[in-house]
Amino acid sequence: MVYLQKQDKEVFDAIKLELGRQRANIELIASENFVSEQVMEAMGSVLTNKYAEGYPGKRYYGGCEFVDIVEDLARDRAKKLFGAEYANVQPHSGAQANMAVYHTVLEPGDTVLGMNLSHGGHLTHGSPVNFSGVLYNFVEYGVREDTKEIDYEIVREAALKHKPKMIVAGASAYPRKIDFAKFREIADEVGAYLMVDMAHIAGLVAAGLHQNPVPYADFTTTTTHKTLRGPRGGMILAKAEWEQKLNKSIFPGIQGGPLMHVIAAKAVAFGEALQPEFTAYCEQIIRNSKKLAETLQANDVAVLTGGSDNHLLLIDLKPLGLTGKAAEKVLDEVGITVNKNTIPFETESPFVTSGIRVGVAAVTTRGFDEVAIEKVGVLISEVLHNLENEEVLADVKARVANLTNEYPLYPSL
């Protein structure tokens, strides 16, 4: 960043501070990851200068012959990665990918069945504060109060009752596997479209460690970061018959020019995900997640559903008499980054919450194995049991520093 350092020291200094934070902290926010240096290089390339409204071979601007190569690479790699007939890599985010699908087959006021946000869903799955809940008539399904897991018979009953035009499967805070085949059966029974938002688990799906929704869903959306370990962005997968309508929904429907530097970075990340090393990485994610859940529970910290099948888990703080807001703050002070999160049947506000969400994708990228993640579980437990004990917190902070020093992040930057 030699040019930035010379020309804009304020921005340069802020970026360096953030790099220092990422290096020094144990990053456990489930939606975050550390991209490779080559993904960052693509993001910072001259492609940021190029406007390319339209699609490869059908642009509204001249001079697109080389960005066409990049977008074709991204689309082809995405289709290969997930076994899809069609891929659109232009959505700027997962939210815009979801918006485009809704825009393709729904009319304002149509009924959609989606997962309750506090039970693990997402804002774009019908939250009243989101465009989805404003434009469409979303009705909810959730998890069982006893197991905190999806009960597919309850989903079926809701579908039969409300007769939705679309069912949305997928979650932002659900630690167990989702059976997309069962969702397909329910959708077929009521004549609904099925959209799967696999944003959190896309990397695990690509690695063959979670059921692939693409064969079952009419539309599959995802972000390209999180477990897929690419740049921040979105993507839509579907059968070839939807190509024309979905393309129009993205452009000119809800977006203008695509971000070609981001699409290049997506292509790089998809190429990485096609390698055997990526499968090994995702296998380590699962091992780490299970070890973290096991360690927390052994140290009297409540883990919802008793464990995890993916990269994340939810901690229930009610037995400890804590709030997510308080726990997030103190954990951050000792160098452990998590986010407060609502839990099923929540009694606190979304700004306070009764839980925290913890994910291991980023630390696994950093090289943490089961031995290291067990240490992380012990550190979290010590903080949660000693939230106001300055001596314990100081000791944890020192041990966090020792642990992160063992696993250098971006040493070449």
Curated annotation (Swiss-Prot):
Q: Which InterPro entries match?
A: PyrdxlP-dep_Trfase, PyrdxlP-dep_Trfase_major, PyrdxlP-dep_Trfase_small, Ser_HO-MeTrfase, Ser_HO-MeTrfase-like, Ser_HO-MeTrfase_PLP_BS, SHMT-like_dom
Q: Which residues bind (6S)-5,6,7,8-tetrahydrofolate?
A: 117, 121-123, 349-351
The GO molecular function terms of this record are: glycine hydroxymethyltransferase activity; pyridoxal phosphate binding
Subcellular localization: Cytoplasm
Matching PROSITE patterns: SHMT
Q: Which UniProt keywords apply?
A: Amino-acid biosynthesis, Cytoplasm, One-carbon metabolism, Pyridoxal phosphate, Transferase
| Keyword match Transferase | yes
Q: Which Gene3D superfamilies match?
A: Aspartate Aminotransferase, domain 1, Type I PLP-dependent aspartate aminotransferase-like (Major domain)
The record's CDD domains line, in alphabetical order, gives: SHMT
Cellular component (GO) terms are: cytosol
Write down the required cofactor(s).
pyridoxal 5'-phosphate
- Enzyme Commission designation: 2.1.2.1
**Domain of life assignment:** Bacteria
GO BP term, example: tetrahydrofolate interconversion
Enzyme class (EC, first level)? transferase
Quote the pathway field.
One-carbon metabolism; tetrahydrofolate interconversion; Amino-acid biosynthesis; glycine biosynthesis; glycine from L-serine: step 1/1
According to the UniProt record, list the residues that bear N6-(pyridoxal phosphate)lysine. 226
Q: Kindly state which reaction or reactions the protein catalyses.
A: (6R)-5,10-methylene-5,6,7,8-tetrahydrofolate + glycine + H2O = (6S)-5,6,7,8-tetrahydrofolate + L-serine
Assembly and oligomerization? Homodimer.
- Described purpose of this protein according to its UniProt entry: Catalyzes the reversible interconversion of serine and glycine with tetrahydrofolate (THF) serving as the one-carbon carrier. This reaction serves as the major source of one-carbon groups required for the biosynthesis of purines, thymidylate, methionine, and other important biomolecules. Also exhibits THF-independent aldolase activity toward beta-hydroxyamino acids, producing glycine and aldehydes, via a retro-aldol mechanism.
Q: Which family does it belong to?
A: Belongs to the SHMT family.
Q: What is this protein called?
A: Serine hydroxymethyltransferase
The organism that produces this protein has a lineage beginning with: Bacteria, Bacillati, Bacillota, Bacilli, Bacillales
